[in-house]
């Protein structure tokens, strides 16, 4: 099989996987709209599938507003929580690439992963954010809180609108 045929086959498989994955989630949301979806065991707050779907849609709009495109990388570092899960699923269903970074990595390693991945956007928990050096993240245009999606810092004025 030629390199061209392999590339076309891979592209078709990628498209089919994305379409099928999105369809599975869409059907799950429809079937369970009013049922509990995610629970934060620290706060005991539970969100429904409807809330989850709306949050994913808001993140998609946010990505579009700030110019994130399919294939762009979005990094996330912090403890797993409902926001982490929502960002993860929103990113992959948008067509961007999620770069999950273990919260326990030392700051130099975490920063290296962000830079090496060429992430354009970073979501970080407060404790992780305080240990990172935003100015040395070459490609990251904006960094937001993993806890409440508020803006920590951005490189250009007006990059991040109040979409979230």
Which residues fall in each region the model found?
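A general structural signal for well-ordered alpha-helical segments in protein cores
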Residues: 22-25, 84
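Structural core segment of the AMP-binding/adenylate-forming
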Residues: 66, 93-159
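Short, positively charged and aromatic/hydrophobic N-terminal segments
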Residues: 3, 9-14
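Conserved AMP-binding/adenylate-forming core of the ANL superfamily
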Residues: 17, 37-81, 85, 89, ...
């Amino acid at each position: 099989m030629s390199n061209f045929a392999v590339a076309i086959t891979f592209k078709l498989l990628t498209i089919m996987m994305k379409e099928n994955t999105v369809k599975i989630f869409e059907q799950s949301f429809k079937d369970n709209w009013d049922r509990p979806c995610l629970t934060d065991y620290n706060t005991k707050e539970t969100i429904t599938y409807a809330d989850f779907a709306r949050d994913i849609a808001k993140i998609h709009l946010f990505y579009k507003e700030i110019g994130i495109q399919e294939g762009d990388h979005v990094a996330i570092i912090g403890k797993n929580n409902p926001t982490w899960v929502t960002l993860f699923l929103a990113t992959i269903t948008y067509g961007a690439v999620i770069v999950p970074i273990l919260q326990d990595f030392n700051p130099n390693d975490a920063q290296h992963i962000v830079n090496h991945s060429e992430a354009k956007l970073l979501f970080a928990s407060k404790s992780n954010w305080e240990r990172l050096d935003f100015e040395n993240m070459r490609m990251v245009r904006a960094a937001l809180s993993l806890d409440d999606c508020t803006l920590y810092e951005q490189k250009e004025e007006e990059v991040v609108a109040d979409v979230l």
